[in-house]
Amino acid sequence: MIIEICATTINSIINANRAGANRIELCSNYSVGGLTPSIEYVKEALSISEIPINVLIRPRPGNFVYNDNEIDKMKKDIISIMDLGVNGFVVGSIKSNGEIDDEFINDVRALTNPLDLTFHRAFDYLSSQTRSIDKLIKSGFSRILCSGNENDAIEGITNLISLNRYSNNKIVIMPGGGVNKENCLEFKNAGFKEIHLSGILKNNSPIILDSDYNTIKEVVYKTK
């Protein structure tokens, strides 16, 4: 099973590599669900990581309906990062009517080809998810990160299983949101090939935003 770690700190990247994770989603501002990281952070991450890094492109907190200036900002951020050696990008945009932003996903695919592309948890807010899966497959996206329309993926696992069945191995459905060492095996047993988690210990006070080495290692071991 592929284990993707959401990393917002250098220690998280180090721990993900040491613990045997397969890929990193690099972002900043974990507390608001992740935003586009700085160029400096991307460069430092690439210099120390031996596993692939996909960079989140999200210009602000809040919803995923973006105006023209925000769309342009995301494209410019992609252009400034794509030649640094990243594996791919994590993106998403929704139209005001709840449909997937076809123009944006097609533009990003053309801009980044042949880099790896993930459509992020904006997917959970789409009005027609099966139609969106078809469009993402056609656009050449590799995977969809989602939680099955619930806050936690374990709560949405029934919906996730339905989406996974519909995708028919043409695109990866990657559960994310509340995935942890206690429930990770449920996703493997349900037939998912990849999972996404932060590995942050939520019971720490104050919360330390480093992905925990032992947590990642246990998830890797359980899902072999």
Locations of the language-model features?
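Active-site mouth loops of central-metabolism enzymes
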Residues: M1-T9, I57-K75, T118-S128, I173-M174
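Hydrophobic faces of well-ordered beta-strands that scaffold small-molecule active sites
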Residues: I3-A7, I24-L26, I53-I57, F89-V91, ...
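Active-site beta->alpha loop and helix N-cap motifs at the rims of alpha/beta catalytic domains
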Residues: I10-S12, L35, V42-I48, P52-D102
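Catalytic cores of alpha/beta
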Residues: N11-R18, V65-D77, D124-S139, L163-S167, ...
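Glycine-enriched alpha-helix->loop->beta-strand junction motifs that scaffold or abut catalytic
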Residues: A19-I24, S49-P52, G85-G88, L111-L115, ...
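Glycine-rich phosphate-binding active-site loops on the catalytic face of alpha/beta enzymes
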Residues: I24-L35, S80, L84-S96, F141-I154, ...
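Alpha-helix-loop-beta-strand connector modules within alpha/beta enzyme cores
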Residues: G34-P61, I100-A122, E155-N180, S211-K224
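Hydrophobic, well-structured mid-protein blocks that either form specific transmembrane helices
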Residues: M82-S132
